Design a protein with these regions (language model features):
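Short, intrinsically disordered or compositionally biased N-terminal tails of bacterial proteins
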Residues: 2, 28-30
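Extreme N-terminal basic, low-complexity initiation segments
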Residues: 1-11
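Non-transmembrane, aqueous-exposed alpha-helical and coiled segments at domain scale
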Residues: 20, 30-326
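Short, low-complexity, charge-dense intrinsically disordered segments
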Residues: 13, 19-22
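Intrinsic disorder/low-complexity segments, especially N-terminal tails and targeting/processing regions
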Residues: 6-8, 17, 31
Length: 326
């Protein structure tokens, strides 16, 4: 293998390493030792975020709009049908006039996924924040971030910082997920550390309690993301990541897929309906992500996604490739 000087990577100051990479250092520069590698630049990540924000603020994803239209066909003469008519017409006007779907243009969640042998510059977070600030200013989107949750609730004035995660995954390539998350849907969400003895029944009961108590405040019909497992800090990420999956797409795990359908049927059987004004469709879909956990724990997170489920995924092409050999 060949030691590749980091200074060659568009002057990147730091690099995050995939599994199998090794690190060496001399007095001048860090080196990354890998068989092969691909580079994605911070400029490409920032561009993806900058271009996605105004688009998803004004245009519902096709799968979400199609699900609203299907729900309207199935609704019948209910007050929920009126809600769906308004949501569909609102989406049409927003896309046509390029104005926000909702006055709450949300906080920005960015999730960068990098596959095996991908090199990512460490200061990408600063570039993402700059892209968010420019996008919100130029598109005249509402700024909704305060400086400190407890001690200084002054608006930052540019909707930064974005809430950015970086993950290395087994899937090849790199992609950026962008989501605009309104306050109402997150406020209706929940994280619970159940005892293992609660089991499947306890998980179901907690989900249904959250739905009955909180769903009306989350602007339904909803997409419900459910995370089960991992740890206290990671289970919420599982639930939010579940919202990235298109409406109608079931989990690749047949057990999780069956549970998704079971929970979707149970949630819609409440009769709360669109806008919680009565009807057939309280949820457009339920997505479940599971993970291992400690033997003494059963972490559960429920993340509500509102009817304005604003998200996009952008595949990134590597800026260059390299191969080593020592």
């Amino acid at each position: 293998m060949l030691a590749i000087a980091i200074s060659r990577f568009r002057n990147a100051k730091t690099v995050r390493f995939t599994q199998g990479a090794t690190l060496a250092r001399d007095e001048r520069v860090y080196y990354c030792v890998m068989d092969t590698f691909e580079i994605i630049t911070k400029e490409d990540v920032a561009r993806a975020v900058y271009e996605a924000i105004p688009r998803i603020a004004c245009e519902l994803p096709g799968d979400v709009l199609a699900a609203l239209e299907e729900a309207r066909k199935a609704e019948g003469p209910t007050r929920g049908a009126f809600v769906l008519d308004q949501l569909i017409e609102n989406a049409r006007i927003a896309a046509c006039d390029q104005v926000p779907i909702c006055q709450d243009t949300g906080t920005v969640w960015v999730c960068l996924e990098a596959g095996p042998d991908m090199l990512v510059p460490g200061d990408v977070f600063a570039f993402v924040n700059d892209a968010v600030a420019r996008a919100y200013d130029e598109a005249r989107l509402r700024k909704s971030v305060v400086r400190d949750a407890l001690f200084d609730r002054a608006n930052t004035g540019d909707n930064t910082p974005a809430f950015t995660d970086m993950h290395f995954v087994d899937r090849p390539g790199a992609r950026v997920h962008v989501m605009l998350k309104g306050g109402g849907s997150d406020n209706a969400s929940r994280v619970v550390m159940l005892a293992p003895g609660a089991g499947r029944e306890g998980v179901v009961n907690e989900i249904m309690d959250c739905v009955r108590v909180k769903a009306a405040n989350a602007c339904p019909p909803l997409v419900v993301g459910i995370g089960v497992g991992s740890t206290f800090d990671k289970v919420a990420h599982l639930a939010k990541s579940a919202l990235l999956r298109p409406v109608g797409e079931r989990s690749s795990d047949p057990r999780a897929a069956a549970f998704e359908q079971e929970m979707l049927d149970a949630i819609n059987a409440t009769g709360m309906g669109p806008g919680a004004l009565g009807g057939r469709t309280l949820a457009l879909d339920v997505h479940v992500e599971t993970a291992p956990c400690h033997i003494a724990a059963l972490p559960l997170a429920i993340n509500m996604g509102c009817s304005a489920m604003r998200r996009a995924t952008v595949e990134l092409a590597p800026a260059s490739k390299g191969r080593g050999g020592r």
